[in-house]
């Protein structure tokens, strides 16, 4: 595998071009970003894995350099797109680390295609459906403000703590693909909202780590033990004080936890 990031393309079953990127050395690690985000979601932490893993990222359909069809999206489709990338690379089995909506997509991959996943990390995510814990009405109202700048500030504060924001003014790579068309943004929102993997979770046979920030109210922290209890043999690790973007702000804690898990510790 290449050690320098570059963008190439795989073709999904419906002909949609899916952009993907490679970097690092070693066994493959598929990194899946959050809703309405492209591969830059991982910019702040990708180098942490470079010495021991070949990282594979992708731009979801509707984001980045990938095609942006107007047909419905779903986490099932995102999972199939990710597998198209692995197929293009000739990768039969990979470690998979999904955060937020990427964690929902990772659940589908691991549940429906267990032979493709060595180790699974589910970060700041939810099983969805009737069993998942939803964000509060207050959080929804803060994100739905007509004042777009106010809504963006609200999202930033859900992702990061005030202490972090005081020292890191941005721009932040976890705030959504700025060039994403409106139709794709709506389709991503619907795909995430309609996700329901509850019945699939017991079929996950990969060794699994569930990671979450204790102070995450964007995707409520109560979802983490729910996932860990539903997936056979899953481990649970809660990062004290972290909000949604625990993997970036609390990189010094989260990175070693993930690396130790990948190493079999």
Q: What do these predicted ranges mean?
A:
Residues 9-67:
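Conserved HGGG/HGGXW glycine-rich cap/lid loop of the alpha/beta-hydrolase fold
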Residues 57-97:
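Active-site loop/oxyanion-hole signature of alpha/beta-hydrolase fold enzymes
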Residues 107, 111-112, 118-146:
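Flexible "cap/lid" loop of the alpha/beta hydrolase fold
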Residues 204, 210-212:
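Short beta-strand/loop motif that positions the catalytic acidic residue
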Residues 215-219:
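Acidic catalytic loop of the alpha/beta-hydrolase fold
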Residues 131, 150-200:
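Conserved alpha/beta-hydrolase catalytic His-Asp/Glu region
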Residues 225-245:
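Catalytic histidine neighborhood in serine/cysteine hydrolases
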Residues 242-255:
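Catalytic histidine-centered segment of alpha/beta-hydrolase-like enzymes
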